[in-house]
Swiss-Prot record:
Extracellular side: 60-605
Chief location of this protein within or outside the cell: membrane
Protein known as: Cadherin-15
Domain of life of the source: Eukaryota
Job of this protein: Cadherins are calcium-dependent cell adhesion proteins. They preferentially interact with themselves in a homophilic manner in connecting cells; cadherins may thus contribute to the sorting of heterogeneous cell types. M-cadherin is part of the myogenic program and may provide a trigger for terminal muscle differentiation.
CDD domains documented for this protein: Cadherin_repeat
Keyword list, A-Z: Calcium, Cell adhesion, Cell membrane, Cleavage on pair of basic residues, Glycoprotein, Membrane, Metal-binding, Repeat, Signal, Transmembrane, Transmembrane helix
One GO process term, biological-process aspect: homophilic cell adhesion via plasma membrane adhesion molecules
GO-annotated cellular components: caveola; Golgi apparatus; neuromuscular junction
Length: 784
């Protein structure tokens, strides 16, 4: 360059020991700033190496370096610096003397925040013109060991199986140091300060890995190990920090379960199941609740019928002996069981064998009162339909399992819905006590079910329940009959028409019903000569003519027989009308009339029809009379003045004397047959005012008249209620003002029965002839 900066690194602090030398020029890096001091020679500016300064410097301000320019004399150059630490954040860390070029440190440095600063230096003349090109000034912060190492966790956790071999990895401890990792200030070393005795674990000082160093880890001895860890910088000679490591020992099945006794004694009641009779205690040193601890029990011998089982109590790990099949004291009084115990998890091969891996269990059976037992339950038997009372059904006896107690058994009924059976209380013999109806609702598919009880005489007694199922055998007690109607018609020509189809029914069930056999009565020889019956199927036959017979009604005697054992036979009369037929095989119209008159309606049938007609007419008449009587009674209850009560020469009059202003009465026909109200000459159709109503009275709205006689009572009740609730009418308990009606009265005063216009000894004995309703009057006024 034309002119070079003469950088004088005036070491104000002798401790740094820095000396600056002008490097020899190198042609390969020559810049075109020349200064002709000699032919063929160029001078270059100083190359300034990084300036190092320690962090945490206490003496401030502290001189770092001095820069100078050789272009002008001292005092004619102004120096300045720019960059981070000067006019950029962090500000005011560095400053420069503008006349001397000395650079000062003004604040304490922290390498962990900023490890170097890059500044720009400027040289100007007094007029502010640039004398030299700007040059770079780099300041490097030298690290000090001012940060302790730190573990990433306060507590490190690891797990390892007991019995692990040496060198087994457990966990890894990790730590950091904020100092310069390129220096010993961040060179960390790990160690174990404390772990107890014996020492089963070691830590790699460089990586922090924790591993086992010897055998002998036993969870049953020590389940958890607590280690104190340390990390130090300066390769172990500097600052330190500590943390903890918790190592849990996982369980393996290295301990076999053992019984606490060589023999257990228990008692069990007979004839019960699903009950616990005792517990088998075991010990296991492995982790409670784990598969290495949970016990499983096996009955090796002594229970060939599988009457016992052993399950494990999950809380106590005890074996619970339970009875799954009822025991019988009379069959066996004692059981000797041999039981073994193992864990759910298999035992480790290196584990020692248990001394009490098996035990004996003695179970004594207690004798109890057992209920009687029916050898055959349910008991099925059969009896003929319609069996008479006293017919033996079965003997439903039970036996007592308690052979040593010599108990007596009694029998009774528990369920016999038809009360059909009778049970001998001592023997259990069952017989009928009446005839069972075939239509009983308790017969299901021909079976009748009853429940019998057997009771011993123990205290308290025991009861057994037995079911008796009785099949009611069908008996052929009904003969077949022709299906209705037992009549029909045939063409007079034998070859005409399809014939007459005959059907039969039977109230008996199979096999006492169909097939049915149809036969003309052999006792009437003429039937076989003129008529024939051919079987169609098991329940129907066809009747035909062999020869032409006279037209009209013919009565044929038929024999019907079923297939029961023994068979039942019925003789039945068949009414057959023979008529002339057309080409289609049906009776001609004239013949049909003849046939209709002789279908075979008997005199009894005609009487029934006529009687039914008469009964129907009588019922209709009674219904009409009852309707009229009810209407008349209803009218009497509402309008007492309309009754016409005639008692010989005594008449009932409604005359109440003269002087009444209101001469208009209700028309009952209008009540029974209301019509629409017609408009009158009164304005707005208002009704006439009552004479006893105040002048401010406002008539009530028109009420709708009843539409049927049955509503008359409601109509009158509504009118009474309207009058009672009328606020414009004075109340009944106040004095009313009536218009003057004049003196005297056309009608005289009412006289008593004793006051007579004739002689005083009038005879009232005729009142006795009027019936019980006048008996009281006859006693009062008749001759004594």
């Amino acid at each position: 360059m034309g002119s070079a900066l003469l950088l004088a690194l005036g070491l104000l602090a002798q401790s740094l020991g820095l000396s600056w030398a002008v490097p020899e020029p190198k042609p390969s890096t020559l810049y075109p700033w020349r200064r002709a001091s000699a032919p063929g020679r160029v001078r270059r500016a100083w190359v300034i190496p990084p300036i190092s300064v320690s962090e945490n410097h206490k003496r401030l301000p502290y001189p770092l370096v001095q820069i100078k320019s050789d272009k002008q004399q001292l005092g004619s150059v102004i120096y300045s610096i720019q960059g981070p630490g000067v006019d950029e954040e962090p500000r005011n860390v560095f400053s420069i003397d503008k006349f001397t070029g000395r650079v000062y440190l003004n604040a304490t440095l922290d390498r962990e925040k900023t490890d170097r600063f890059r500044l720009r230096a400027f040289a100007l003349d007094l007029g502010g013109s640039t004398l030299e090109d700007p040059t770079d000034l780099e300041i490097v912060v030298v690290d000090q060991n001012d940060n302790r190492p730190a573990f990433l966790q306060d507590v490190f956790r690891g797990r390892i199986l007991e019995g692990a071999i040496p060198g087994t990895f457990v966990t890894r401890a990790e730590a950091t140091d904020a100092d310069d990792p390129e220096t010993d200030n961040a060179a960390l070393r790990f160690s174990i300060l404390e772990q107890g005795s014996p020492e089963f674990f070691s830590i790699d000082e460089h990586t922090g890995e924790i591993r086992t160093v010897q055998v002998g880890l036993d969870r049953e001895v020590v389940a958890v190990y607590n280690l104190t860890l340390q990390v130090a910088d300066m390769s172990g000679d500097g600052l330190t920090a500590t943390a903890s490591a918790i190592i849990s020992i996982d369980d393996i099945n290295d301990n076999a379960p053992e019984f606490t006794k060589d023999e257990f004694f228990m008692e069990a009641a007979e004839a019960v199941s699903g009950v616990d009779v005792g517990r088998l205690e075991v010990e296991d040193k492995d982790l409670p609740g784990s598969p290495n601890w949970v016990a499983r029990f096996t009955i090796l011998e002594g229970d060939p019928d599988g009457q016992f089982k052993i399950y494990t109590d999950p809380k106590t790990n005890e074996g619970v002996l339970s009875v799954v099949k009822p025991l019988d004291y009379e069959s066996r009084e004692q059981y000797e069981l041999r039981v073994s115990v193992q864990n759910e998890a298999p035992l480790q091969a290196a584990a020692p064998r248990a001394r009490r891996g098996q035990t004996r269990v003695s179970v004594w059976v207690q004798d109890t009162n057992e209920a009687p037992v029916f050898p055959e339950n349910p008991l099925r038997t059969s009896i003929a339909e319609g069996a008479p009372p006293g017919t033996s059904v079965a003997t439903f006896s039970a036996r007592d399992p308690d052979t040593e107690q010599l108990q007596r058994i009694s029998y009774s009924k528990d369920y016999d819905p038809e009360d059909w059976l009778q049970v001998d209380g001592a023997t259990g013999r069952i017989q009928t006590q009446r005839v069972l109806s075939p239509a009983s609702p308790f017969l299901k598919d021909g079976w009748y079910r009853a429940i019998i009880l057997a009771l011993d005489n123990a205290i308290p007694p025991s009861t057994a329940t037995g079911t008796l199922s009785i099949e009611i055998l069908e008996v052929n007690d009904h003969a077949p009959a022709l299906a209705l109607p037992p009549s029909g018609s045939l063409c007079s020509e034998p070859d005409q028409g399809p014939g007459l189809l005959l059907g039969a029914t039977d109230e008996d069930l199979p096999p006492h019903g169909a097939p049915f056999h149809f036969q003309l009565n052999p006792r009437v020889p003429d039937l076989g000569r003129n008529w024939s019956v051919s079987q169609i199927n098991v329940s129907h036959a066809r009747l035909r003519l062999r020869h032409q017979v006279s037209e009209g009604l013919h009565r044929l005697s038929l024999l019907l027989q079923d297939s029961g054992e023994p068979p039942q036979q019925r003789e039945q009369t068949l009414n057959v009308t023979v008529c002339r037929c057309g080409s289609d095989g049906t009776c001609l119209p004239g013949a049909a009339a003849l046939r209709g008159g002789g279908v075979g309606v008997s005199l009894g049938a005609l009487v029934i029809v006529l009687a039914s007609t008469v009964v129907l007419l009588v019922l209709i008449l009674l219904a009409a009379l009852r309707t009229r009587f009810r209407g008349h009674s209803r009218g009497k209850s509402l309008l007492h003045g309309l009754q016409e009560d005639l008692r010989d020469n005594i008449l009932n009059y409604d005359e109440q004397g003269g002087g009444e202003e209101d001469q208009d009465a209700y028309d009952i026909n209008q009540l029974r047959h209301p019509v629409e109200p017609r408009a009158t000459s009164r304005s707005l159709g208002r009704p006439p005012l009552r004479r006893d109503a105040p002048f401010s009275y406002v008539p009530q709205p028109h009420r709708v008249l009843p539409t049927s006689p049955s509503d008359i009572a409601n109509f009158i009740s509504d009118g009474l209620e309207a009058a009672d609730s009328d606020p414009s009418v004075p109340p009944y308990d106040t004095a009313l003002i009536y218009d003057y009606e004049g003196d005297g009265s056309v009608a005289g005063t009412l006289s008593s029965i004793l006051s007579s216009l004739g002689d005083e000894d009038q005879d009232y004995d005729y009142l006795r002839d009027w019936g019980p309703r006048f008996a009281r009057l006859a006693d009062m006024y008749g001759h004594q």
